[in-house]
Design a protein with these regions (language model features):
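Short hydrophobic membrane-inserting helices
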Residues: 1-19
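Conserved non-transmembrane functional hotspots
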Residues: 21-175
Length: 175
């Protein structure tokens, strides 16, 4: 049988071509890995920025809501002293509300979608709000005898809301 001999120039060209293709393949894999890492980092940064923005919005919405409750409380003190009418005070409070329509729903949506870890703490706030509002909606008589208890419940509400604001700040630091 005849032996087939391959000229060295062809063999050198084949080896060079294979080496080049292998180098391109390795380079592409490294580039692909770098791009994947870069994309993941950019996605993480965008996600953190969105969460920070939503946390700021939630904080502002919470403060407006809290201020409305506090203003209602302050307006109700004369009702407990017998110096004002509860219906007139509630009307004045609703006309001068800091919240806009849908603010509380927006707050709840942000809480549930972005910060579910805060739902329990906000539940404590809502429970305390319910106690305070019993004094404002006729659940507990607006008499001078109940004024001290009303003020104590409002002070407890303010402590709970301060604790919730602190938890919001903690989340901001963690982001």
């Amino acid at each position: 049988m005849d032996k087939i001999t391959v000229p060295w120039t062809i063999l050198t060209a084949v080896i060079s071509a294979l080496s080049a293709l292998l180098g391109v393949h390795i380079s592409n894999k490294a580039q692909e890995k770098r791009l994947k890492i870069q994309f993941e980092n950019e996605a993480k940064v965008r996600s953190l920025e969105l969460k920070k923005k939503k946390l700021e919005e939630m904080f502002i919405l919470f403060q407006k809501w809290e201020m409305d409750i506090t203003c209602l409380y302050l307006r109700f003190i004369p009702v407990f002293k017998g110096e004002a009418n509860a219906a007139a005070v509630q009307n004045a409070a609703s006309e001068n509300s800091l919240q806009e329509k849908g603010d509380h729903q927006k707050f709840q949506a942000i809480l549930n979608l972005y910060f579910p870890e805060l739902k329990e703490a906000f539940g404590v706030v809502m429970d305390k709000r319910g106690v305070v509002l019993k004094y404002c909606n006729g659940g507990i008589a607006a008499t001078p005898d109940n004024l001290d208890a009303f003020c104590a419940e409002q002070n407890a509400f303010e402590l709970v809301t301060a604790n919730f604001r602190s938890k919001l700040a903690d989340v901001a630091v963690e982001l």
